[in-house]
Amino acid sequence: MLIFAAPSRTVSVLCRYLSFGPSNMHHRLLSVLAASAVVGVNAATTASPYDYIVVGSGPGGGPLAAELDRAGFSTLLIEAGGDEGDNPTFADIGNFNEAANDEATRWDFWVKHSDDPARDLKFTHNTWDTGDGTFYYPRAAVLGGCGMHNAGVCALPADDDWDIIAKKTGDKSWSADNMRKYLKKIEKNEYLPAGNAAHGYDGWLSTSVANNSWAKNDSLPDTKILQKLAELTGQDPDNAANLVNRDLLESGKKADDTSSFYNMVTHADAKGKRSSPNNYIRATLADPVKYPLTVKLHTLVTRVLFDNTTTLSKPSVAPRAIGVEIMEGASLYRADPKYAPGAKCPISQILANREVIISGGAFNSPQILKLSGIGPAAELTKFSIPVVKDLLGVGENLGDNYEGSILARGSAPVESRLITLLLRTPSAPTRKLNIYAWCGAFSFEGFWPGFPTYYGPTQYSCAMVHMAPKSQAGSVRLASADPQDWPEINFRFFARHGEQDLREIVEAADILREAINAAGPPVAPLEERHPCPGGKAAANCTDAAQAEFFKLQAYSHHAMSTCAIGGDGDRMAVLDSRFRVRGAAEDIIAEAKKLPR
């Protein structure tokens, strides 16, 4: 999926790619950019070769650093991981499961889903718990970030989601009408004829789609499932072969509130080669005379530095970020599976003439902010961190999409063909689509080292994502003042309006189950493994039983909103509409892991 943020006074273009589906397409930018600092450096006496320092090379920070450098600003891009751009595991988009499990790029977080340990222990794949949480949550530490190991799905938010930000902040540049141009700026469309006004053809990000000609064959089990889904979601079954080619990146209100099939768009070229920020960064580095971008790999940022004239001794002076403190070396962060306990490297400092930009993602951006003295004062004081700016919202408001699946085994194998569907369930409180689903010969039950489980050649699944969760009660809080330590992460799933969200998920499951069972021979009959072993007629397939299953077995990987953008009257807002940390000096920018929902 792609999300583009309005350019700040720097020239930023922000995008976010999803791993397995546009589940957060209505809610978030995965990279949070935020600037902060600690006291101790006098900028007036120290020169720097860099105008900008960008921390994090993922879909937010990587393209931003390249854009800044191409605009004529000397830019330093800092990445904690290495460069796997020449590794075929990451080059081919179809290798996403292998890529996500590769220790060369993984950061392994362990998170909680609730404040009830007994509840969390009921997750089927909790055997990998390390004691810090029950649920495995993979992240990427590599040049290009998550764009290097995800499944590459590209999607856009609903128009209403852009307009909500514009209304919250009073900044009309966030309006849906204005945001489309950023897709066109970075896209290199490879699946539509040139000249389509909704797309771009000269950007750095290749987009492509699959060949869905199989849908014209009415005898295929996949086609029978497709046609049943059409019937159940108010579409024309006789036109299903054409509907599956609908553009997932199309524009218009109808795309926001009409259940429909789509052809999944991926950030890959027509040959299946991954297109990511890694490519754009490398293309910029390839011309060092024209674009003198500097990249530091295997470098952990421990905090952001303040000019020593902007301390708490002068509360009327807004804190001004002037650089970062770093530790150089591979695998220095505890989440790295190659981390060696006790590993330490020398600390050094790098200064910026203009701005510091943090793009560490939903977990690490708030951690860096807090380690730098920006966050809830009570939490910082607990770890003896000097408070530079008391901002209650840093690390709060954490949310994510709820994900789940129906998994069955057929009487015969089904070819690997993918059905992509966006739908609105009957009890959804608004007209907006609330479920993204994709069906095919795969299994997807969540995340654990080595995922997914292979159930044999007859496996068939419909995975789904709740795109409009109503609870954002989670948090990212410091476990210690050690920058090599991971934070404490608790999503508090279903804490608010959980019954309604679960009702919508169960309704989607019932639709998908009925469609799967329309596959016909030789695939039918199918044996459902979950959520209803034995199928809909089984005694364990009540609405309540299904809701309990999804409550306990839900998983996610689109964390958001821990440094949320908000209006002047929002006490939990961390950033303004130009990605600047609230209460910091004009030259402190944050470019966004933080759509407010």
Regions found by a protein language model. Give the residues of each.
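Structural core of flavin- and non-heme-iron oxidoreductases
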Residues: 21, 26-95, 137, 143, ...
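N-terminal FAD cofactor-binding segment of flavoenzymes
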Residues: 73, 80-141
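Classical eukaryotic N-terminal signal peptides for Sec-dependent ER targeting/secretion
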Residues: 1-33
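Intrinsic disorder/low-complexity signature
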Residues: 14, 21-24, 39, 48, ...
